[in-house]
């Protein structure tokens, strides 16, 4: 676009993988930096637990050790140290109010921990515990698309006259499920098609509050869902191509929206 996205934005929100993107932009990393971070570390992030550990019924598929090391290396300091507002949803399973959003007010929370807690997707990665033994899992359990969390945080802080660019990392895919299912089938459906998808309710809400012209929902269409743990080169290149084609097809609209 000719300018760094961090030069044209003042606040960020992201859940799960989006938490890394949002935190990275707030940290001052460029979009290219974050692309390289993902591309160079995807296979390390999705390191499968040994087969004998996975014999345990509650063992997730992937060991989060490498992800933790990467986050500790790239994100130093506390959440309160960020210079721009950041909102990172997570889910705390053993407190009364399970919906938690890390932000600048969490001055005693390490940045890396806030991000890791938002990425702890059930069945994929381990739960994450803080020093008080509070248990955290993926923020996508309740807010996979935190556009309304961002808007609420900004309004609460007194911001006005802003626009929101919403990047749908899950993309738009066909909804073709029908019929009754077994208990296990419904569980898989709810997890894959609801928890892991981008809910558009927040987009509708923000458009009704800010106006249609103040919200741009960027979401490429793809014929089928792509599992988040597919890290082969063909899949990575396919995703890059999908987003590249989407950008060039909508470039004029995006630049006009951002006034670049």
Where are these regions (language model features)?
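Patatin-like phospholipase
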Residues: 1-260
